[in-house]
Amino acid sequence: MPEHTGFLTYLLAQLPGLRENARNIGKTFIGHHTVDYRGTEPIFMSLLIMVLFVLLASEVRGQYRRLNESVIPEDKLTLRTFFEAFFGYFYGMARDVMGPANAKRYFPLIGGSAAFIFFSNASALIPGVNPPTSNLNITIGCAVVVFVLFNYYGLKENGWSYVAHLAGPKWYLAPLIFPIEVISTCVRPVTLSIRLMLNIGVDHLVASIFLGLVALFVPVPLMFLAIIVIVVQTLVFCLLSCIYIGLATEKADHH
């Protein structure tokens, strides 16, 4: 903070920049915004995170090969044990929600979503990096993939009875229930994407404000809060995805 400047005056001087940061959160290509580095940055960061994850997965695969040659298992946290705990937890969650058979069948979607969202969220901990999941384009893309696939899985498992099931058990209630069910199903990707974008974007914005005001020590508690937000939002997205897939693939009760 410059000399002979009050704290309130200094804070007010930062407001134009903070407002600009707030406007950039969730900016999409659909509006009247020109595509600049702010628009391409989330895409670049998403690609970078996916490449990084592939490299880490390759390293873990190499560790498994070396593990087969060793007699004593590792007793410390390594990249391999972290991946085991990470994907083991989400597989257990999918098994509890969808059942063992569906968890094994649909875990590639859940595990892939968990990895991408977690590492994208975690990039917010790096100073100067805007997490891809703070942009609505990226979160909508993730949510649309889940939306398309759980409907595809539902049609694959139950056929057209999956669509008929949306009309409810009684035919005379179908004109009322069917539109409500269709709307509630179509709203799912909207709520998934907006919830993730707002939580990560606002958390990152608040952390940026405090880092701009006080660079040392004070933002440390916010970093712990950010870690909680990162984990919770990954869990929420994947848990809801499991629920949607479970509801879509359960055998319809015909009346």
UniProtKB/Swiss-Prot annotation:
Membrane topology designation: Multi-pass membrane protein
Function comment: Key component of the proton channel; it plays a direct role in the translocation of protons across the membrane.
Family affiliation: Belongs to the ATPase A chain family.
UniProt cross-references to NCBIfam families, sorted A to Z: ATP_synt_6_or_A (TIGR01131)
GO biological process: proton motive force-driven plasma membrane ATP synthesis
Protein name: ATP synthase subunit a
GO terms assigned for molecular function: proton-transporting ATP synthase activity, rotational mechanism
Transmembrane segments: 40-60, 109-129, 135-155, 163-183, 196-218, 230-250
Location(s) in or outside the cell: Cell inner membrane
Principal subcellular localization: membrane
Quaternary data: F-type ATPases have 2 components, CF(1) - the catalytic core - and CF(0) - the membrane proton channel. CF(1) has five subunits: alpha(3), beta(3), gamma(1), delta(1), epsilon(1). CF(0) has three main subunits: a(1), b(2) and c(9-12). The alpha and beta chains form an alternating ring which encloses part of the gamma chain. CF(1) is attached to CF(0) by a central stalk formed by the gamma and epsilon chains, while a peripheral stalk is formed by the delta and b chains.
SUPFAM superfamilies associated with the record: F1F0 ATP synthase subunit A
UniProt entry keywords in alphabetical sequence: ATP synthesis, Cell inner membrane, Cell membrane, CF(0), Hydrogen ion transport, Ion transport, Membrane, Transmembrane, Transmembrane helix, Transport
GO cellular component, one term: proton-transporting ATP synthase complex
Leader sequence residues: none
One Pfam family here: ATP-synt_A
Cystine pairings recorded for this chain: none
